[in-house]
């Protein structure tokens, strides 16, 4: 799965949860893992210290520490040296040196432990604790992003060289066969990188941005700023009126994204029909999702007959994209610093629910406008806040969540 540097927002979340003061220049790596919503492993210098997730039951951020977290946090509970196997076991109270500390810990809460040359994580169980995991004591040093970049510079340059060769190959072919070539640009980090790489190779590159009418103002402003700074030949296409189609099609969902066809593909198809064949450079990467992991460098569009998409940064991870941006001092959309991973329509059903609730915090007018629509279509507040509206047919994990919430209400 994909990885990335922790954003300013994510570092703020970690600092609040852990009562820490991590600085924004630290190379804290987050790796996506399966879950109901936002769920990522947190790495410091290659060591996983725990899992950061957005809890859809409590609608709040949670941190689940691993044993390695207590390499940077003083363990609260001291256990007497023993030859007993402790991992996965409840600890007899007489082995706990400072058992009085347990009275301030809630049932099932995490607590750090120290036993001899080991530190670890446990959970409170009754009048004692149960050890979840232990790790040998060692120094865990923080790495700064600038140090990470210095160590990985050669690898990033190799990725760039390969991507440029892919673009050159298709550009030469298009010139020889008199085919058109352009690039799609969303205002996000991936298409920023693929666009700038293509701009190094292709003369008078046509850069296509589709304004669906549902983008954040931040994105519209950034697209203009980006095009001006890098002297791009920007073409802005307007999407069809989403609100008109909404009444006929209903709420767009992850399993029925009619909005993508109406607001993006239809106007693009209309614009590209002047070409016999067109190759479009796209910033999609295989690590972004399970649906993209089987992509190859070239794919015929399933919607636009004369379009073929090419993916020059297909093999890049999220940290590679950000590394290239930092190494080349490239400007990026500030929405990434505010807690958004998906740069697109503000109420996109494919976005995380954690992101949708960030819209509530930062852009209440947009949030309330969409909430009013959802209520008009019959969704209640619980379904809205927990993101049930994002599916036409709920997947098993969301059906299970619904049952948990219903049982909580009965109690």
From Swiss-Prot:
Gene3D superfamilies on file: HUPs
Give GO MF terms, alphabetically. oxidoreductase activity
Q: Name one Pfam family in it.
A: PAPS_reduct
Q: Which residues form a coiled coil?
A: none
UniProtKB keywords = Oxidoreductase
Q: Which InterPro entries match?
A: PAPS_reduct_dom (IPR002500), Rossmann-like_a/b/a_fold (IPR014729), Sulfate_adenylyltrnsfr_sub2 (IPR050128)
Q: Which NCBIfam families match?
A: PRK08557.1
For this chain, the family text in UniProt reads: In the C-terminal section; belongs to the PAPS reductase family.
Q: What is this protein called?
A: Uncharacterized protein MJ0973
Q: Which species does this protein come from?
A: Methanocaldococcus jannaschii (strain ATCC 43067 / DSM 2661 / JAL-1 / JCM 10045 / NBRC 100440) (Methanococcus jannaschii)
